[in-house]
């Protein structure tokens, strides 16, 4: 038993630990993890609001407190739904900004500007505007994959342009805030000039906007990730990483959060 245990430890240390270490330092895994972490407070508060909106009592209860709570929530349901709709209902806003800011920081970019650029890139393809209204269908969980892709893409474009000095540079005498705004003009133009035509092309060819197309392609993978074997494998890998002295939860959730 001792030799078997030592063999298992050796295999983990030689094979799994280096891989886990590389995953844990991977820029995109870190950015995705940070994006979901940034959105977490808003999602928690939004989830709590559902308890107030839908009290855990039977509609025919005779308890005075429960009856009052049910009547109050029914009468003010629209008002109580507002915090939920502006937190859980637009979770991809927070996720896209968090991913863009985290990835931008890792590429030595202005995290505020990279986060805002990621936010704009997501809105451009996921919130179609028609008849004076913006569609919110893909601003919640259905748009998570689109938020990941557009945030990573827009930040990479920003990083590449800055690394190759394809930016507008103002004299040092110009205030820093103004200079930062002009520096991101070209990245904004490139992101709009690539994502918007792509979205229009996909819609013309398939009748679906980009978030719909992404969800259609990834539907089998999402279904597979919700299966018992996938969940058991994720838990197993998490424990193996912990056993190897690595924060398994950060790595596994950073990869699997978009699917869960």
Task: Show where each model-derived region lies.
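Signature of multi-pass transmembrane helix bundles
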Residues: 2-44, 49, 58, 72-244
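Membrane-interface interhelical connector segments
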Residues: 57-73, 256-260
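Re-entrant/interfacial helical elements at transmembrane boundaries that shape
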Residues: 98, 250-260
């Amino acid at each position: 038993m001792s030799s078997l245990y030592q063999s298992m430890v050796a295999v983990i240390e030689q094979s799994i630990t280096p891989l886990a270490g590389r995953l844990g330092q991977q820029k995109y895994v870190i950015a995705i993890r940070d994006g979901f972490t940034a959105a977490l407070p808003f999602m928690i508060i939004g989830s709590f609001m559902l308890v107030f909106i839908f009290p855990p009592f039977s509609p025919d209860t005779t308890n005075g407190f429960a009856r009052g709570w049910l009547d109050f929530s029914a009468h003010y349901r629209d008002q109580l739904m507002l915090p939920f709709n502006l937190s859980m209902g637009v979770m991809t806003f927070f996720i896209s900004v968090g991913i863009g800011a985290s990835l931008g920081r890792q590429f030595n970019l202005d995290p505020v500007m990279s986060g805002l650029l990621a936010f704009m890139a997501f809105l451009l393809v996921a919130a179609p505007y028609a008849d004076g209204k913006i569609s919110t269908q893909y601003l919640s969980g259905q748009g998570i994959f689109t938020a990941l892709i557009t945030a990573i893409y827009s930040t990479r474009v920003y990083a590449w342009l800055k690394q190759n000095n394809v930016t507008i540079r103002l004299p040092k005498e110009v205030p820093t805030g103004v200079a930062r705004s002009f520096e991101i003009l070209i990245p904004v133009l490139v992101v709009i000039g690539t994502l918007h035509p792509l979205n229009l092309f996909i819609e013309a060819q398939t009748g679906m906007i980009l978030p719909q197309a992404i969800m259609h392609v990834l539907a089998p993978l999402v279904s597979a990730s919700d299966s018992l074997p996938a969940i058991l494998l994720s838990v197993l890998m998490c424990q193996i990483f912990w056993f190897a002295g690595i924060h398994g939860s950060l790595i596994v959730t950073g990869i699997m959060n978009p699917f869960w």
